[in-house]
Amino acid sequence: MKIDKKKLIAGILTLVIAACSYVVTEYLREDTPAVSGDGLTVQYIDVGQADCALLQCDGQFMLIDGGNRDDSQLVVSFLEQQGVKELTAVVCSHAHEDHVGGLPAVLAVYPTKAVYAPTKTYSSSIFDKFVYYTDQQGLEITIPAPGDRFSLGQAEVTVLGPVKSYAETNDTSIVLRVTYGETSFLFTGDMETDAENDMLDYWEGKVDWKTDVLKVGHHCSNSSTSYRLLNEVNPTYGVISLGKDNSYGHPHKEPMSRLNQAGVTILRTDELGTIQAVSDGKEVTLTWQNQSAVPENAEPAAQVFIGNKNSKVFHAPDCKNLPSEKNAVEFASYQEAVDAGYSPCGSCLG
């Protein structure tokens, strides 16, 4: 039997390429590891109109953002109360003061193994102090790339964004997915809708986005937390970090409506104080500081999206670009519209 070497080589190359493609697709979808120990604790610290979260797993600690400059003593004292002696990682999601503000004070007090930020330079005195105290620890700021991973005890931290360079500082926000056993937490900083969409496009088919607890983006501004992101993430709980009666009008009614439509239980630091989530690897239990307040337990609302039969674009029911009645088709969910081959409207659905 004569063997065609060219066809044989071509066949082998096809198999190799297919195998590589499978690896790229599956490398963020590995089997869930079994976990043991005291679990993962995530504390969304009440720092007013700002962000700050402390994560603890197997005696290791990670701080994501540090509130405003005026929150420095509050954050340092909170870490002291939690028994922090050393930080495995400090993450500055992006360079705005309401995220980096308290981090210089933290780095001045606590030995830290790694510092992450989306940039090493930014035109502000508080960011300069952040860089200074990082240098004082003998560290360099690490700018993580999409897909980078590190461990916090038995918890796995994966960097999912940003996936491009952006001029808008909010869009440079580092996005982290923290998994512990079968549970997961998502932190999106202040990333806005266009960058969210870029990230979802980048990871399409490669990431299981399902999340137990979503730290709602940009203090629940209408610039973030799009229908598309919520459809992918499908969170059980949404934590909003914001200040009472803040000047920005947060939380905005539009993302609150989207969260309610998705059936997300909403927990707000301006109402509940510091919020604590504890995962045992199977389930997440939430408690909060202000015991007299209760979270907003949303029931999935009746969702209707309007599709344009001609353009194959679907819209939120309050969109200004709705089709005529004879050219309209209704969908009961975002996913139903996507499955029918329709694309989301760029204006109302981001």
Model-derived features with residue positions:
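Non-globular, low-confidence helical/coil segments that flank catalytic cores
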Residues: 2-301, 321, 327, 332, ...
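N-terminal carbohydrate-binding accessory modules
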Residues: 301-309
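Short aromatic-glycine-(Arg/Gly/Cys) micro-motifs in beta-strand/loop hairpins
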Residues: 308-324
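Residue-level signal for mature regions of secreted extracellular proteins and peptides
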Residues: 312, 338-341
